[in-house]
UniProtKB/Swiss-Prot annotation:
PROSITE patterns: SECA, SECA_MOTOR_DEAD. It is found in: Cell inner membrane; Cytoplasm. It holds the Pfam family SecA_PP_bind. The gene is secA. GO terms for biological process: intracellular protein transmembrane transport; protein import; protein targeting; protein transport by the Sec complex. This is Protein translocase subunit SecA.
């Protein structure tokens, strides 16, 4: 009550904002006579003048009145359209990073030109985001005339465009495109192997058309790029024979050389679920691979071109030694199906990763399938929040104002209409059954048809629209059906839906973005006349005038019949969608009417109010075909809609809280990746990684601030020799010195490592080696990031169960995903260091060839799919079900899910590094 009183005295916030904007409108209007005096060239020259003033430090806000006045004058000359005062207000709202709610027919497309022009002055690029390719192309061509007149370039970003066309589109001052394409381009730019392959510039300013559709209806749906890596099924089958030719070692060698009961080629650590090749095993494996023709004679497994073979060999060894049929998996219908070790149930659709599933398939002789992998993913919520400035416009945003403010920080400003609205919104009519409802709809349509009044019938599904079309066919009522599939044809039909006696059936979203003009739209026909080379200018003018006169007659005829009549066949769960349908009628002060016909069988009524309304109907003994038409029922339906909207908002907000965790990690990984791409020499980065890894290794064996007696020098020398190929006489150095600091030993190791590294670089040259290092780093980041995405997905699947243990699932997810991310960075660091340090080089050509192979292997992805599907619970799995991964990130996820920790401190780390858990990932725990 007090709030209502204050609003009456001071006005609502919306009214106060509009009042402020009207002051600026007065300034713009005062400038109009001045700019009318300028020639076309002088008007065009204002753009460059604005650019220089902005470069000199003048803000866009200071330039706004003049820039808007220039844009309006250019529109009068080029488009023959003058911006209304309310459109100037809309332009200011868009420039202030807000959402402009403008009724259908109030000219949103023209309004956007004001804010687009002003922000394009900066030269940083403006993106205008639409819901489909047709609207992007239409608006770019339509408004492009205005921008080109003012000296600005315009690009269109469409799917299936060539790479150079995309780059040109993004380098234009203004770029039109769809939300999907902007999002996918962002993901693709973060998968390139050369900075010149990127298409997007830094994200500066975006205006999102139909902002409610893109930022709310599609907010739960992530964009996903998935694909199949290079087909290596033959390699898995050839590798499958190798484990049978190798001997298994019994017992693990200890630091003092004891512990081995029977020597062999590989050791199986059943506790850590890992397999390791011994030194003898490496030599034997190289011999076998050479005989199979997989590596050259005398070549090492660690040669650059053979690095990926190690991965396949270990997968085959694990498949044979650790995974047993009818225990870990079963074979059904030519497929390997995983068995859940805790429940014993079959996990149909799930696959191990890292090539393990394929190795088991090869072992069992079933068809080896290629694996689909999520390569990159982002939600619209997180993509659009990356823009420096973001604004939007729609006909219906006020009902979702809280969500726009809460999630995107965007305030909704309702722009007044240019002329008062004359549409009559009639009371809903509620029938007992669907049949009675459709009979009433057909009666209403026939009545309008006979009076010459055009009708637009809105349905919630394609099925309903086709059923209704069948009823109208039976009644011999001519009509058009739109199902939101053919956007271009759809726009033409919608544009003519205002002609007398027109009946148009459309699903709610069909034809959105196209106005329904009473009497039909003559612009297209006028365009054909203008383009006819056989007509003189006088003939063209006469024919166009004749068209306009005919249109005026039809326009008056339709107005007299009551304007466009909207028939809703069902209430949507969102009031916003209902308002969009209603908003089709009564554009720019035209007359119009709307009515919804409901039945107790409708989902919304059935769930929320059906029983209550049915009881009223039965008490009143209402005859068949007689509707209820009462304000109390309509209000209870709106109350039900508010409940559903609230529930959907909670779901979207919760999903965003989970996705924000992945988003922060995505930003970090993409930043690291871009640093690697743009670095002149990655040698310094690799040197820092190497130093970090060696310090960690050293501190595992020689802890800081400890006595000499506590140092494990023998273990350290063994690790340096086996993992790094470094012979550093640490024990002899200690024996020969009276006293020695641990830092001196560390310096010895660093010196030996640097000398070995420099000798490799000297063999091939700094430039060649830097190229190889860059490829290895990118390969490691990309491979492990893809695994990490699957690990996060897997963690997300079961995290809600933590609630039963009185823990907050969101906090648990944050904590454990951070641990996973820390491990991911650790694994990348170790892998890059190990590969670049141990690579065996013969010539620069060999190294360059290896770099090319690495990049080709990563970029050669078959069956790449761009997904953006509707789904209910959150993230749509790329595969039928999320893949349990066996890589490092997944090993950690499995541990986390099982409640952490399962690995003993002295057990080998599940990441496969060969170190003890306490000396590897155990430190992170």
């Amino acid at each position: 009550m007090i709030t209502g009183l204050l609003k009456k005295v001071f006005g609502s916030r919306n009214e106060r904002l509009i009042k402020q904007y009207r002051r600026t409108v007065a300034q713009i209007n005062a400038l109009e006579p001045k700019f009318e005096q300028l020639s076309d060239d002088e008007l065009r020259g204002m753009t460059e003048a604005f650019r220089q003033r902005h470069a000199g430090g003048e803000s866009l806000e200071a330039l706004l009145p003049e820039a808007f006045a220039v844009c309006r004058e250019a529109s009068k000359r080029v488009m023959k359209m003058r911006h209304f005062d309310v459109q100037l207000i809309g332009g200011m709202v868009l420039n202030d990073n807000k959402i402009a709610e403008m009724r259908t027919g109030e000219g949103k497309t023209l309004t956007a030109t004001l804010a687009v022009y002003l922000n394009a002055i900066t030269g940083k690029g403006v993106h205008v985001v639409t819901v489909n390719d047709y609207l992007a192309q239409r608006d770019a061509e339509w408004m492009g005339r205005l921008y080109n007149f003012l000296g600005l370039s315009v690009g269109v970003n469409l799917s299936q465009m060539a790479h150079d066309q995309k780059q040109a589109a993004y380098n234009a001052d203004i770029t039109y495109g769809t939300n999907n394409e902007f999002g996918f381009d962002y993901l693709r730019d973060n998968m390139v192997y050369d900075p010149s392959q990127r298409v997007q510039r830094p994200l500066h300013y975006a205006i999102v058309d139909e902002v409610d559709s893109i930022l709310i209806d599609e907010a739960r749906t992530p964009l996903i790029i998935s694909g199949q890596a290079e087909n290596q099924t033959d390699l898995y089958q050839r590798m499958n024979g190798i484990p049978k030719l190798l001997e298994r070692q019994i017992g693990e060698e200890k630091a003092d050389g004891t512990g081995v009961e029977k020597p062999g080629d590989y050791y199986v650590d059943e506790k850590g679920h890992q397999v390791y090749l011994t030194e003898a095993g490496h030599e034997k494996a190289e011999e076998i691979l050479s005989q199979l023709g997989l590596i050259g004679e005398g070549e090492s497994l660690y040669a650059p071109q053979n690095i990926t073979l190690m991965h396949h060999l270990y997968a085959a060894l694990r498949a044979h030694s650790l995974f047993h049929r009818d225990q870990h998996y079963v074979v059904q219908n030519d497929e390997v199906v995983i068995v859940d070790e805790f429940t014993g149930r079959l996990m149909t659709g799930r696959r191990w990763s890292d090539g393990l599933h394929q190795a088991v398939e090869a072992k069992e002789g079933v068809t080896v399938q290629q694996e689909n992998q999520t390569l990159a993913t982002v939600t619209f919520q997180n993509y659009f929040r990356m823009y420096e400035k973001l604004a939007g416009m729609t006909g219906t945003a006020d009902t979702e104002a809280y969500e726009f403010q809460e999630i995107y920080g965007l305030e909704v400003v309702v722009i007044p209409t240019n002329r008062p609205t004359q549409r009559k919104d009639l009371q809903d009519q509620i029938y007992k059954t669907g049949k009675e409802r459709y009979d009433a709809v057909v009666r209403d349509i026939r009545d309008c048809y006979e009076r010459g009044q055009p009708v637009l019938v809105g349905t919630t599904s394609i099925e309903t629209s086709e059923y209704l079309s069948g009823l109208l066919d039976r009644e011999q009522l001519p009509h058009q059906v739109l199902n939101a599939k053919q956007h271009a044809r759809e726009a033409e039909i919608v544009a003519q839906a205002g002609r007398p006696k027109m009946i148009t059936i459309a699903t709610n979203m069909a034809g959105r973005g196209t106005d329904i003009v009473l009497g039909g739209n003559v612009e297209k026909q006028a365009g054909f006349i203008e383009a006819d080379p056989n007509l003189s200018d006088a003939d063209k003018a006469a024919r166009i005038q004749q068209l306009k006169d005919e249109w005026q007659s039809l326009h008056e005829q339709v107005k007299a019949a009551g304007g466009l009549h909207i028939v809703g066949t069902e209430r949507h769960e969102s009031r916003r969608i209902d308002n969009q349908l209603r908003g089709r009628a009564g554009r720019q002060g035209d007359p119009g009417s709307s009515r919804f016909y409901l039945s107790l069988d409708d989902q919304l009524l059935r769930i929320f109010a059906g029983d209550r309304v049915r009881a009223i109907m039965e008490r009143l003994k209402m005859p068949e075909g007689e509707p209820i038409e009462a304000g109390i029922v309509t209000r209870s339906i709106e109350s039900a809609q508010r409940k559903v909207e609230g529930r959907n908002f909670d779901i979207r907000k919760q999903l965003l809280q989970y996705d924000d965790v992945a988003n922060d990690q995505r930003k970090e990984i993409y930043k690291l990746r871009n640093d690697v791409l743009e670095a002149n020499d990655v040698g310094e980065m690799v040197a820092n990684l190497r130093e970090s890894v060696l310090i960690e290794l050293f501190r595992d064996h020689v802890p800081a601030d400890t006595m000499e007696e506590q140092w494990n020098i023998a273990g350290l020398e063994t690790r340096l020799r086996e993992d790094w190929g470094l012979e550093v006489p640490l024990a002899k150095t200690i024996e020969g010195a009276q006293s020695i600091e641990d830092e001196e030993l560390l310096n010895l190791i660093m010196k030996a490592a640097t000398e070995r590294y420099e000798s490799k670089v000297a063999m091939v040259g700094r430039e060649s080696f830097a190229g190889f290092e860059r490829s290895v780093m990118l390969q490691s980041i990309d491979t492990h990031w893809r695994e990490h995405l699957a690990a996060l997905d897997h963690l997300r699947q079961g995290i809600h169960l933590r609630g039963y243990a009185q823990k907050d699932p969101k906090q648990e997810y944050k904590r454990e995903s951070f641990e996973l991310f820390a491990r991911l960075l650790d694994v990348i660091k170790n892998e890059v260091t190990r590969v670049t340090f141990n690579v065996q080089i013969q010539s620069p050509e060999e190294l360059e060839q290896a770099s090319e192979q690495i990049e080709e292997g990563l970029s050669h992805l078959e069956n790449v799919q761009y997904k953006h599907d509707e789904f209910a619970e959150g993230r749509e799995p790329v595969e039928e079900a999320p893949s349990p991964r066996t890589g490092t990130a997944m090993a950690a996820a499995e541990l986390a899910l099982a409640g952490m920790p399962k690995v003993g401190r002295n057990d080998p780390c599940p990441c496969g590094s060969g170190k003890k858990f306490k000396q590897c990932h155990g430190k992170l725990s």
